[in-house]
Amino acid sequence: MKNFILLAVSSILLVDLLPTHFEHNVDLSRAINVNGVSFNNVDTSSLGAQQVRQSASRGRGLGEKPKEGADKEKKKEKGKEKEEEPKKPNENKLKQPNEGQPQAQGDGANAGQPQAQGDGANAGQPQAQGDGANAGQPQAQGDGANAGQPQAQGDGANAGQPQAQGDGANAGQPQAQGDGANAGQPQAQGDGANAGQPQAQGDGANAGQPQAQGDGANAGQPQAQGDGANAGQPQAQGDGANVPRQGRNGGGAPAGGNEGNKQAGKGQGQNNQGANAPNEKVVNDYLHKIRSSVTTEWTPCSVTCGNGVRIRRKAHAGNKKAEDLTMDDLEVEACVMDKCAGIFNVVSNSLGLVILLVLALFN
């Protein structure tokens, strides 16, 4: 009796190891195939990544310590080289004209003013050029008036100064008329710039004013170009044109925005029915085994682990004989069972078989 039990158990283990066709899903090739644990496929490409590089200059082998004398000599040589290197003399930087600094020269040029050009003065702006007065700038020299400065000379008026000389009026006085600008005064007329005043008319620039008309640049505005360009307004061109921010704000709409992304995820997240579609041969084999037991209910999965199929009769073939069933009379569905144990199943069965054999032989 004892030997019969041992023989029965050992035979069960052997059957479990070998591939059979008795509806037991044991594939020896799959069981032996170890996913991700293949000792035959060894990547040897990284074996030479950690080669030890010896120093050719010193020629010392691995594990040797560098000689202290050699290190000291090298340190001394490096120290001598550093001492022998002549110190580079400090180069004097070229004196550049400081923007925003007085002492600007030119016809109505106001030092430190950015790029304002025109016949009118660029009031309160650096590097303003023109024949008009430069309102609110110190020590400007030229034909334009030095606005806000006491010793301004030229044809323009000295804006805001009592001792202004030239043809222009003394800036800071109401109703001044002439070639000089009446800085800080309303209704000033003439060739000079009316610094900081609205509705100024004439050849002078209307410093910092939006409605300036004439040949003078609207001072206080960067990048003004042309006669009477409104300086400080970006891209303003023309006589007294105060045109801010024109022509370059286009292209705000993204071209072809998000088109093609509407269908980017189409087909994603869906079941991969093409890959998991049941094989016709597998279905036929399974049907041949359980043809007599197929009903309108789903049959058990054809495998005990992994991917398999299950079938059932369609409604119109419910009363049809089992021998007459075809693929058109059946509904087939893929089924997924728990993942097969693989190598662990083989090892456990092998250990069990060895134990049984030992017990059978020594008892």
Swiss-Prot record:
Where do glycans attach? T304
The region annotated as signal peptide is: 1-22
Cell compartment(s), UniProt: Cell membrane; Cytoplasm
Q: Where is this region: 12 X 12 AA approximate tandem repeats of N-A-G-Q-P-Q-A-Q-G-D-G-A?
A: 98-241
Keywords for this protein: Cell membrane, Cytoplasm, Disulfide bond, Glycoprotein, GPI-anchor, Lipoprotein, Malaria, Membrane, Repeat, Signal, Sporozoite
PTM note says:
During host cell invasion, proteolytically cleaved at the cell membrane in the region I by a papain-like cysteine protease of parasite origin. Cleavage is triggered by the sporozoite contact with highly sulfated heparan sulfate proteoglycans (HSPGs) present on the host hepatocyte cell surface. Cleavage exposes the TSP type-1 (TSR) domain and is required for productive invasion of host hepatocytes but not for adhesion to the host cell membrane. Cleavage is dispensable for sporozoite development in the oocyst, motility and for traversal of host and vector cells. O-glycosylated; maybe by POFUT2.
Q: From the UniProt entry, list the residue stretches annotated as the region Region I.
A: 93-97
The biased composition feature labelled Low complexity covers 260-277
Q: How does it sit in the membrane?
A: Lipid-anchor; GPI-anchor
UniProt-recorded name of the protein: Circumsporozoite protein
- Its gene name is CSP
